[in-house]
């Protein structure tokens, strides 16, 4: 067998690009550097859902209650003094080495009964006002239960006592 050779030039299909690596690392612009700040560990405690937000207004609470009712869940108010509101060694019966925030054998006192017949947010606001008037130095949270699954679905703080020193405004939460 004989092979014929020709003088053809071979052109590559694609040229390779040189990779240029930056000489330094950056997180972007200087305005994004706030995301890299240090969390303030003192007097900066949170309760469940929405705790990272400023205190909820009555309108915001009403919208949350409307969402709860649209899902056929039952709202309920609970309250606790500042000595019982957070998990500590003194107020928690531990079954093991650790404690979470809900299943820790530390229960808040229920305000009246769950609001089975509740039809709008104004009824819950009336009960929050009554509970705040009766216990002005207590933390008050709104929880909701799903009767079908028999579990607590959500819980969030609706009243923080005036004397509370454990809350920081969002702008003051980082160093």
Curated annotation (Swiss-Prot):
Transit peptide boundaries = 1-34
Q: Which UniProt keywords apply?
A: Calvin cycle, Carbon dioxide fixation, Chloroplast, Photorespiration, Photosynthesis, Plastid, Transit peptide
Q: Which GO terms describe its cellular component?
A: chloroplast
Q: List where in the cell it is found.
A: Plastid, Chloroplast
Membrane-crossing ranges are none
A GO term, aspect molecular function? ribulose-bisphosphate carboxylase activity
Q: Which residues form a coiled coil?
A: none
A Pfam family annotated for this UniProt entry = RuBisCO_small
The alphabetized list of GO BP terms reads: photorespiration; reductive pentose-phosphate cycle
Q: What is its main location?
A: plastid
Family classification? Belongs to the RuBisCO small chain family.
Extra remark:
The basic functional RuBisCO is composed of a large chain homodimer in a 'head-to-tail' conformation. In form I RuBisCO this homodimer is arranged in a barrel-like tetramer with the small subunits forming a tetrameric 'cap' on each end of the 'barrel'.
What function does this protein fulfil? Answer: RuBisCO catalyzes two reactions: the carboxylation of D-ribulose 1,5-bisphosphate, the primary event in carbon dioxide fixation, as well as the oxidative fragmentation of the pentose substrate. Both reactions occur simultaneously and in competition at the same active site. Although the small subunit is not catalytic it is essential for maximal activity.
PANTHER family associated with the record: RIBULOSE BISPHOSPHATE CARBOXYLASE SMALL CHAIN 1, CHLOROPLASTIC, RIBULOSE BISPHOSPHATE CARBOXYLASE SMALL SUBUNIT, CHLOROPLASTIC 1
Subunit (UniProt): Heterohexadecamer of 8 large and 8 small subunits.
What name has this protein been given in UniProt? Ribulose bisphosphate carboxylase small subunit, chloroplastic
| Organism of origin | Batophora oerstedii
